[in-house]
From Swiss-Prot:
Subunit structure: Homotetramer.
Enzyme class, first EC level, given as a word: lyase
EC number(s) from the headed UniProt entry: 4.2.3.5
UniProt source species: Desulfosudis oleivorans (strain DSM 6200 / JCM 39069 / Hxd3)
Name of the protein described by the UniProt record: Chorismate synthase
Originating gene: aroC
Catalytic activity: 5-O-(1-carboxyvinyl)-3-phosphoshikimate = chorismate + phosphate
Gene Ontology CC annotations of this record: cytosol
Length: 354
């Protein structure tokens, strides 16, 4: 199975399945001397772990305690591969026994079977969101590397269930269960999720990620453009179905005079480019958005087929999120951190004489 590794110089490989013994990541290419311990990684992981307190989140309880098995000595990275893992403690495979022979609508069951001829039906196996543990653990390492260069990355809920934030105050993100920067829409979001949950259905939304302090010059034309890699990173997350940078799709309806970010001695007058021009960072804030689809595991009865192609109906009763938001927010943040850390190292490799 290819496609488990991401990055060029700062490379990460995730491993593990939803109901296997454990999950984790191997990070290769992290420079030596970086301060790193399990507590620091855990702080970021706690934002994505199951049972995090939101009414939109799964009832599955996983501590997801990070264990660093290699690549760190006396609190510093050694430059060798870093392995971070956690054990799966609360997997209940019996919840999937009755539907093991059915293809779940909206899931990768049917496509994994088509590709490999075999699939792990316990919670989606490798296609489960449990895989994102490794992404976030690696993102925590990347975030520390970026911090040393004055770069910070933050993600928040821009929209949930069709209800959109009207103002952005990142100081409010950690103050509510949905990770939303606008407290005035919290009641509406709560009502929306509650109603959908009562029906046994699910909702999607939009996550916005911003990166500040990114220097001009990151990105490798033409096929490794910074925005292309950010788009790939976000699209690689299972629930993400669309990505835009800066003005994004709105730019298609603009005139050139409105779309262009005029340049002044103090910098850019606007940021429709989202901090990236010609695939290279321009020194402005990087802004990306990810469209997150509704969780496909729902209690409402739907039509499907079994593994023999015969018609069947299915209603999924396991412990599932009502929305991937807000748990997916930190996954989006982590993926942008990985891209920026990789491109930062790539830029340093060609500019060390300057």
């Amino acid at each position: 199975m290819a496609g488990n590794t991401f990055g060029e110089l700062f490379r990460v490989t995730t491993w593990g399945e939803s109901h296997g013994p454990g999950i984790g990541v191997v990070i290769d290419g992290c420079p030596p001397g970086l301060a790193l311990d399990e507590a620091g990684v855990q702080k970021m992981l706690d934002r994505r772990k199951p049972g995090g307190g939101s009414i939109a989140s799964t009832a599955r309880k996983e501590a997801d305690r990070a264990v660093i098995l290699s690549g760190v000595f006396e609190g510093k990275t050694t430059g060798t591969p870093i392995l971070i893992m956690a054990h799966n403690r609360d997997a209940r495979s019996s919840a999937y026994t009755d539907i093991a022979g059915l293809f779940r609508p909206g899931h990768g069951d049917i496509t994994y079977t088509a590709k490999y001829g075999i699939r792990d039906w316990r919670g989606g196996g490798r296609a489960s969101a449990r895989e994102t543990f490794g992404r976030v653990a690696a993102g925590a390492v990347a975030a520390e590397l970026l911090r040393l260069s004055g770069i910070s990355v933050a993600a928040y809920t821009l929209e949930l269930g069709g209800i959109r934030a009207t103002t952005i105050d990142v100081g409010q993100v950690d103050q509510n269960m949905f990770g939303c920067p606008d407290s005035t829409v919290m009641a509406a979001m709560t009502d929306r999720v509650t109603q959908v949950k009562r029906r046994g259905d699910s909702v999607g939304g939009i996550v916005e990620v911003r990166a500040d302090g990114v220097p001009a010059g990151l990105g490798e034309p033409v096929f490794d453009k910074l925005d292309a890699d950010i788009a790939k990173a976000l699209m690689s997350i299972g629930a993400v179905k669309g990505v835009e940078i800066g003005a994004g799709f709105e730019a298609s309806g603009m005139t050139g005079s409105r779309s262009n970010d005029e340049i002044t001695p103090q910098g850019f007058a606007t940021n429709n480019a989202g901090g990236i021009l010609a695939g290279i960072s321009n020194g402005d804030r990087i802004v990306a958005r990810a469209a997150v689809k509704p969780i496909p595991s729902i209690g409402i009865t739907q039509q499907t087929v079994d593994t023999n192609g015969k018609p069947a109906s299915i209603s999924i009763k396991g412990r599932h999120d009502i929305s991937a938001i807000p748990r997916i927010n930190v996954v989006c943040e982590a993926m942008v951190c990985l891209v920026l850390a990789d491109h930062l190292l790539r830029q340093k490799a060609i500019s060390w004489t300057r």
